[in-house]
Curated annotation (Swiss-Prot):
Key words, A-Z: Cytoplasm, Elongation factor, GTP-binding, Hydrolase, Magnesium, Metal-binding, Nucleotide-binding, Protein biosynthesis
Protein name: Elongation factor Tu
PANTHER family for this protein: ELONGATION FACTOR TU, MITOCHONDRIAL, ELONGATION FACTOR TU-RELATED
Record note on quaternary structure: Monomer.
CDD domains listed in its UniProt record: EF_Tu, EFTU_II, EFTU_III
Broadest EC class assigned to this enzyme: hydrolase
EC number: 3.6.5.3
Length: 398
C-alpha cells in the first residue's frame, strides 16, 4: 500500500519535551498522542505508549550517537513533529548538534519536586540554542494536596525562567497529570487538550526557510569560458533569482558584491533556486580566484564575517570516536563550518581547568580567518579530520 501523501495544508511546527529526569517528559508525550487520538481521531493521530517512545532508536548526527523519539500528531489547526530525548545526555547532544531544531518546547516540572538541576540546565540550553518559546507543564499535581505548595512551585519555576531571560511572569503554566490523562481520566484529558490549545496559540508559526534571507554555502567553484564564474552548493535558506544582488562573505576580510546572471540545477536553467536545492549560480563580475569553498553567498547585509564568538559545545566521548584525554585552555583545533575547516583557539570559562570527553561547556573561540556566522550557526570541532566535538554559536563577540 502506498504511503499516505504528506498533507501540507496545515502549518508544520517542531516541538519537544524538556525537563529533569523522571519528571514525566515521556509520559506527557504518550499522553498527548493518546488524548489527541481519542479526541481528534485522524490518520496522523495514533496513540503511542510510553514503552514505544522510551525505546527510541539510536541515530547518528554529525558523528554523535543520540537516542531520540520522534512522534507526530495534529491539532485542529496544526501538524506537529515532537521530539522526546530519554536521557539527559541525549537531550544535551540533541540541542547542541541542532539535530532537533525546536520552534518551541514544553518544560515538564514535577509538582512533587519543583525545579531540579536539569530543569535549570535545559532552560539555559534552550536560551543558548535559540528555542525562544517555552510552555510549562506542571506534572503530577494529583500527588500534591496542598494548593499553596503548587503556587510556590509555580513561582519558583517562573523565577528560574526569568533568570534566563524568558518571560517568566507571562509565559503559560498548565497544571495537570500526564499519567492520569493517559489512564483516561477525563478531567486530566481536558487539561491535555488545554495544553495543546496553548501550544497552538503561544508558539508562533515558524518562518518558512524560503522566506528567510538567502544563505548558500559555497562548495565548489568553476569558470565557464565566455560566461563567467559559477559557484555551486545547497541553498541553506531563502531563494536566489536571476538579477539578484548578492554578497560573498567569509574567509577574506572584505565582503564582495556581485549580481546573479544565471541559476542552474541538474544542468537546467531555473528562474529561481529555493532552500534545499543544489544549484549552480553564475556570478557577474567575479573572477575565479575571488570566491572559494567555505564562503557563503548571501542576501546583502544579512550575515557578516566574524572571528570571535561564544559557543555551547559537546565534546565526544572516546566511545563516540572522540578524544581519549581532556583538553585545556588555548586548545587549537579546527572548527568546521558548513563546508570548510578553520583553525581557532578555545578559551575556557573562568574556573574551568579542563574539559573531559563527554562534557558540555560554554567556550570563547577566536578563529584565524573570519567566517560568516550568526547566533544559531552549528559547527563541528575537528582534529586532523576527526570530529571531537559539536557546537552551536550562542553569541557573536567580534
Amino acid at each position: 500500500m502506498a504511503k499516505e501523501k504528506y498533507d501540507r495544508s496545515k502549518p508544520h511546527v517542531n516541538i519537544g519535551t524538556i525537563g529533569h529526569v523522571d519528571h514525566g517528559k515521556t509520559t506527557l508525550t504518550a499522553a498527548i498522542t493518546t488524548v489527541l487520538a481519542r479526541r481528534l481521531p485522524s490518520s496522523v493521530n495514533q496513540p503511542k505508549d510510553y514503552a514505544s517512545i522510551d525505546a527510541a532508536p539510536e541515530e547518528r548526527e554529525r558523528g554523535i550517537t543520540i537516542n531520540t523519539a520522534h512522534v507526530e500528531y495534529e491539532t485542529a489547526t496544526r501538524h506537529y513533529a515532537h521530539i522526546d530525548a530519554p536521557g539527559h545526555a541525549d537531550y544535551v547532544k540533541n540541542m547542541i548538534t541542532g539535530a532537533a531544531q525546536m520552534d518551541g518546547a514544553i518544560l515538564v516540572v514535577a509538582s512533587t519536586d519543583g525545579p531540579m538541576p536539569q530543569t535549570r540546565e535545559h532552560i539555559l540550553l534552550s536560551r543558548q540554542v535559540g528555542v525562544k518559546h517555552l510552555i510549562v507543564f506542571m506534572n503530577k499535581v494529583d500527588l500534591v494536596d496542598d494548593e499553596e505548595l503548587l503556587e510556590l512551585v509555580e513561582m519558583e519555576i517562573r523565577d528560574l525562567l526569568s533568570e534566563y531571560d524568558f518571560p517568566g511572569d507571562d509565559l503559560p503554566v498548565i497544571q495537570g497529570s500526564a499519567l492520569k490523562a493517559l489512564e483516561g481520566d477525563s478531567k486530566y484529558e481536558d487539561i491535555i487538550m488545554e495544553l495543546m490549545d496553548t501550544v497552538d496559540s503561544y508558539i508562533p508559526e515558524p518562518e518558512r526557510d524560503t522566506d528567510k534571507p538567502l544563505l548558500l554555502p559555497v562548495e565548489d567553484v568553476f569558470s565557464i569560458t565566455g560566461r563567467g564564474t559559477v559557484a555551486s552548493g545547497r541553498i541553506d535558506r531563502g531563494t536566489v533569482r536571476v538579477n539578484d544582488e548578492i554578497e560573498i562573505v567569509g574567509i577574506r576580510d572584505e565582503i564582495k558584491k556581485a549580481v546573479v546572471t544565471g541559476v542552474e540545477m541538474f544542468r537546467k536553467q531555473l528562474d529561481e533556486g529555493l532552500a534545499g536545492d543544489n544549484v549552480g549560480v553564475l556570478l557577474r563580475g567575479v573572477q575565479r580566484d575571488e570566491i572559494e569553498r567555505g564562503q557563503v553567498i548571501a542576501k546583502p547585509g544579512s550575515i557578516n564575517p566574524h572571528t570571535k564568538f561564544k559557543g555551547e559545545v559537546y565534546i565526544l566521548t572516546k566511545e563516540e570516536g572522540g578524544r581519549h584525554t581532556p583538553f585545556f585552555n588555548n586548545y587549537r583545533p579546527q572548527f568546521y563550518f558548513r563546508t570548510t575547516d578553520v583553525t581557532g583557539s578555545i578559551e575556557l570559562p573562568a574556573g574551568t581547568e579542563m574539559v573531559m570527553p563527554g562534557d558540555n561547556v560554554t567556550i570563547d573561540v577566536e578563529l584565524i580567518h573570519p567566517i560568516a556566522v550568526e547566533q544559531g550557526t552549528t559547527f563541528s570541532i575537528r582534529e586532523g579530520g576527526r570530529t571531537v566535538g559539536s557546537g552551536i554559536v550562542s553569541e557573536i563577540e567580534a
